[in-house]
Design a protein with these regions (language model features):
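Alpha-helix N-cap/helix-start capping motif
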Residues: 19-20, 134, 168
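Short, surface-exposed basic-aromatic patches at helix termini and helix-loop junctions that form
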Residues: 141-143, 179-183
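Short amphipathic alpha-helical segments and helix-helix/interface helices
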Residues: 23, 153-156, 175
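TOPRIM metal-binding catalytic domain and adjacent DNA-binding surface shared by DnaG-type primases
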Residues: 1-69, 193-196
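Acidic beta-strand-to-loop metal/phosphate-binding motif
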Residues: 160-178
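A generic structural motif
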Residues: 148-151, 165-168, 182-196
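Phosphate-handling DNA/RNA-contact segment within nucleic-acid enzymes
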Residues: 50-161
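Internal amphipathic alpha-helical segments of the cytochrome P450 catalytic fold
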Residues: 137, 171-172, 184-185
Length: 196
């Protein structure tokens, strides 16, 4: 029996041929496809529609009646026989011109809680960049992570900080997820400087 994720991945791979919208997206956002491929698998532009569940989660599906969306794979890692192996844990989609309208294939409780799981599992104390959207993450060559859905606080606790957030709102969200342990972690916001 094929799982929902396997079925949707098959659909994604069938639609993954570059189209004019894909080329425009890659070019306009200066995405290095070779650099991001190991971290997000396939990048496609496909017609999708999303629905909001009663608990506020957003799910998407491929639909000929949908709107053009960017779709990527959420890669996680599992340990098997002493080896760390990547696998696709979920699919993530957003309208091509609205990167903050995020939806996943599997929703809360299933799939992957964040993009950039390997970054969150780092062993040094370099700051973990927490990006506000998958697009912002892709533009950096997938440096850091993106919080996708509930359960991400476990990853944040494992990462241990310091964290660099894009803005004050995101920093507050990270602190909220860290709870009473937030003071033990540095949650930073880069200071923007005006060019002279």
């Amino acid at each position: 029996m094929t799982s929902k994720l396997d079925w949707m991945r098959q659909q994604l791979y069938q639609m993954a041929e570059p189209c004019p919208e894909w080329w425009d997206f890659i070019k306009q956002n200066k995405i290095d496809v070779g650099a991001v491929d190991p971290h997000c698998g396939t990048i496609a532009v496909a017609l999708c529609k999303s629905v909001e569940t009663i608990d506020g989660d957003r799910l998407f599906e491929f639909s000929p009646n949908g709107i053009p969306c960017v779709v990527i794979e959420a890669i996680c890692f599992r340990s098997e026989n002493g080896n760390i192996n990547p696998y696709t844990a979920d699919l993530v989609a957003w309208p091509i011109h609205s990167p903050d309208e995020l939806a996943t294939a599997l929703g809360a409780g299933d799939g992957c809680e964040l993009l950039g799981a390997w970054s969150a599992c780092r062993t040094d104390q370099t700051p973990l960049k927490v990006h506000p959207t998958p697009l912002a993450w892709l533009k950096t060559g997938c440096d850091g992570c993106v919080m996708l859905k509930p359960g991400v606080e476990n990853w944040l606790h494992k990462a241990g900080g310091p964290f660099i957030c894009g803005d004050a709102e995101q920093a507050r969200e990270v602190c909220s997820m860290l709870g009473d342990q937030a003071p033990m972690h540095d949650v930073l916001i880069p200071q923007l400087r005006r060019a002279a």
